[in-house]
Curated annotation (Swiss-Prot):
UniProt lineage: Eukaryota, Metazoa, Ecdysozoa, Arthropoda, Hexapoda
Alphabetically ordered keywords of this record: Activator, Nucleus, Transcription, Transcription regulation
Principal subcellular localization: nucleus
Cellular component, GO, one term: mediator complex
Name of the molecule in the record: Mediator of RNA polymerase II transcription subunit 27
GO biological process: regulation of transcription by RNA polymerase II
PANTHER family: 34 KDA TRANSCRIPTIONAL CO-ACTIVATOR-RELATED, MEDIATOR OF RNA POLYMERASE II TRANSCRIPTION SUBUNIT 27
Length: 295
């Protein structure tokens, strides 16, 4: 058998791989310092073009070497390895046990793949091989709570100096009216057990007269600030999996405004800052802060 064409093909393959490696190395390096400052991009592209031309030429040479190879006319023989099964002394030849183990592993692989193919053909459109009759429990939705659930939740909340009252002007979603001592009033628009909006006004302002009054802001700046902070707390306490806890936490936080005009700021110790009292309440400790002092 003539081995010279094979050696030529292998040599040409090494040359081709080397030229391809130079292309990727040049692409990874990018523009180098030896390209200079003027026209460095053009020099880089020219160098890359030359390397690609070299790869193309080496590929053609490799294809010509492949065409010169002639396939063997006779099947390949195992030569002396065909007599390994006749070897009786395992200490002299340790390859035979490994071959036997490989054949056993191949037989098991073929058997298991046959079983897997049969199961996949029977369950081609199913994600599971077996039929499962259990249905996944639907997750509770906080905006689909019944009116009785809302009534029971609000009825179980009791605080001093706070009055809670539920109204349903449209017989669907509830509006929770909160009165804190003689300090302020608030309208909490609920969708099921989900808080959608909070309107805060002074104690003397109209809030229960009509539906429109429950969406308009207060004419006092201090209560508009409290309303903005209530929206922040509403988003902070929101919990789709525990909506009852979210409402309880929000009402507990909102009740801390009973001392809106009494407690000083915990940071600066002053009652007024920019003509406003401490309108912010910490979400965990409920301590009063001015909006500029809470940072």
């Amino acid at each position: 058998m003539n081995l010279e064409p094979i050696n030529n093909a292998l040599s040409q393959l090494r040359v081709l791989r080397s030229s391809v490696g130079q292309v990727f190395e040049t692409l990874g390096t990018g523009v180098r310092a030896d390209h200079g400052e003027e026209g460095k991009e053009q020099k880089f592209l020219q160098e890359l073009q030359e390397l690609l031309n070299s790869v193309n030429a080496n590929l053609k040479d490799f294809e010509s070497c492949i065409n010169d190879l002639t396939p063997p006319q006779t099947p390949l023989t195992l030569a002396n390895s065909a007599y390994l099964s006749l070897e009786t002394n395992l200490e002299r030849q340790a390859l035979y046990p490994h071959l036997v183990q490989s054949y056993k592993w191949h037989d098991k692989l073929h058997e298991y793949s046959t079983f897997a193919s049969t199961l996949l053909q029977q369950n081609s459109l199913k994600r599971s091989y077996y039929t499962n009759t259990k249905r996944r429990r639907s997750l509770p939705s906080s905006h689909l709570a019944t009116p009785q659930m809302v009534e029971n939740l609000i009825g179980s909340i009791h605080y001093n100096n706070m009055n809670l009252k539920i109204a349903r002007p449209f017989m669907t979603n509830a509006i929770l009216h909160i009165t804190i001592a003689r300090v302020l009033r608030a309208a909490v628009i609920l969708k099921g057990l989900l808080i959608e909006w909070v309107t805060v006004k002074g104690y003397e302002e109209s809030l229960l007269d009509g539906v429109d009054e429950q969406w308009t802001e207060s004419r006092h700046q201090v209560f508009r600030k409290v309303q903005d902070h209530a929206h922040s707390a509403m988003l902070h306490f929101f919990s789709p999996t525990l909506p009852e806890l979210a409402i309880r936490s929000f009402i507990t936080w909102f009740r801390s405004y009973v001392t809106l005009f009494a407690d000083p700021c915990k940071k600066c110790g002053k009652h007024l800052h920019n003509t406003l009292p401490p309108t912010w309440r910490d979400l965990r400790t409920l301590e009063p802060f001015h909006e500029e002092c809470k940072q």
